[in-house]
A protein has these predicted regions:
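N-terminal positioning helix adjacent to the helix-turn-helix/winged-helix DNA-binding module
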Residues: 5, 9-12, 152
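Short, basic, alpha-helical segments at the C-terminal edge of helix-turn-helix-like DNA-binding modules
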Residues: 57-63
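Hydrophobic alpha-helical connector segments
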Residues: 68-96, 117
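Short, hydrophobic secondary-structure boundary micro-motifs
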Residues: 99-101, 114, 142-143, 169, ...
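C-terminal peripheral helix-coil segments that are non-catalytic and often amphipathic
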Residues: 165-216
Length: 216
């Protein structure tokens, strides 16, 4: 089935925003890329602000569904690793939202509250996940300071929200898979002090994959 013009506009806009940055593009640039007139673009979207809002709606819907999956996941590190990987895939697909995020939210006030609410939902889901993982470790007999859950969740959120910009600042243009592997590796290093032997074995396997992919 042929894509609707509106969907094509959103798909092309997303690609442009991801590749060149939202701030560097105008509605006319998008129209030129689509080889349509600005008037034709205006028929579907009354400017770039509506395009950004529509893309955010897609992004938000996907995140909410994935967070539900994370909350419903089991207690094992393997299950949570898979859900985190899929979530990072989704964030990567809409990565322009994480390039100069503060400036973008100031520019598009219509999505600011929704974005901050979505981040809080991510934080709570990650905190729930950590509680499940640490609870499992506690059953294994190790003493844990559960106050650290908040700090661990904060640090994981820092990776989620700033890993894109951090890689850009270091001029590392990573494709999707290496980017996600590097982010997962950082998250694993945060969790390693709280892992049991079985969890460490799985983490070591994941890290070997990361190091293999990292090699030129």
């Amino acid at each position: 089935m042929a894509m609707k013009r509106r969907d094509i506009i959103l798909e092309v806009s997303l690609q442009l925003f991801n590749d060149e940055g939202e701030a560097n593009l105008s509605a006319v640039d998008i129209a030129n890329e689509l080889d349509i007139s600005p008037g034709n673009l205006y028929y579907h979207f009354k400017g770039k602000e509506e395009i950004v809002a529509a893309l955010y709606g897609q992004f938000e819907s996907g995140v909410v569904a994935l967070l539900d999956d994370i909350r419903d996941a089991g207690d094992t590190l393997e299950e949570h690793w898979l859900h985190l990987y899929v979530l990072l895939e989704h964030l990567y697909h809409y990565r322009f939202f994480f390039r100069n995020t503060t400036d973008l939210l100031q520019k598009y006030s219509a999505i600011e509250k929704r974005f901050r609410r979505m981040l809080e939902q991510q934080y709570q889901s990650i905190r729930t996940m950590l509680g499940q993982l640490l609870n499992e470790q506690h059953v294994a007999g190790k003493e844990l300071d559960y106050v650290l859950i908040d700090e661990l969740a904060d640090n994981m959120m820092l990776i989620y929200t700033h890993w894109f910009e951090f890689q850009n600042l270091r001029k590392r243009a990573l494709s999707q898979h290496p980017f996600i592997q590097s982010a997962i590796f950082q998250i694993m290093t945060l969790l390693m002090p709280y892992m049991g032997d079985q969890q460490r074995e799985f983490a070591a396997e994941c890290n070997l994959l990361y190091l293999r992919d990292k090699q030129p």
